[in-house]
């Protein structure tokens, strides 16, 4: 069976504002299956932004587990992320899931991987997915050389990634916490 490919998810934190955005393309082999998938969401009473890349079903499974961890730990993003990463690494069924998450609240942004890593990005900028490197490079350049807001940086970074990555389209969803 062919693998689902790609997406681009990027997050930018500047001051007390954070933006998280992603494109909407889902690809199976060389076919675009859907152009308007929603891979960025608000969870935990709209206090946490989360974006996912990887297998769509896998990502939804992880998203449900992450939201349960947030509930269990009263919205403590770091603790919920560490607990999810522990489960992901040690549970046989979860280990097979192929996805990555970026989660952000008012004060913290984290990348959560299937290897059990919970990463706090340097400079408040991170990106995942097939177009992640393009988006992250664009976001860093824009953050260092402009006064654009996090939302504007995310939007422009996704535009650049969509121009360069065949698995990323220009149908963007961006959420912010200010």
Swiss-Prot record:
Superkingdom of the organism of origin: Bacteria
Q: Which HAMAP family match?
A: HslV (MF_00248)
A GO molecular function assigned to this protein is: threonine-type endopeptidase activity
- Iron: is it a keyword of this entry? no
What are the positions of the active site?
Answer: 7
List, alphabetically, the InterPro entries matched: ATP-dep_Prtase_HsIV_su (IPR022281), Ntn_hydrolases_N (IPR029055), Proteasome_sua/b (IPR001353), Proteasome_suB-type (IPR023333)
What is the purpose of this protein?
Protease subunit of a proteasome-like degradation complex believed to be a general protein degrading machinery.
Q: Name one Pfam family in it.
A: Proteasome
State how it assembles: A double ring-shaped homohexamer of HslV is capped on each side by a ring-shaped HslU homohexamer. The assembly of the HslU/HslV complex is dependent on binding of ATP.
The identity of this protein, by name, is ATP-dependent protease subunit HslV
Any one Gene Ontology BP term: proteolysis involved in protein catabolic process
Family statement drawn from the similarity comment of this UniProt entry = Belongs to the peptidase T1B family. HslV subfamily.
Cellular location of this protein? Cytoplasm
Q: Mention any one GO cellular component term assigned to this protein in its UniProt record.
A: HslUV protease complex
Keyword Magnesium assigned? no
EC nos: 3.4.25.2
Control of this protein's activity is summarized as: Allosterically activated by HslU binding.
Binding-site positions, Na(+): 162, 165, 168
Question: Catalysed reaction per UniProt?
Answer: ATP-dependent cleavage of peptide bonds with broad specificity
UniProt entry keywords in alphabetical sequence: Allosteric enzyme, Cytoplasm, Hydrolase, Metal-binding, Protease, Sodium, Threonine protease
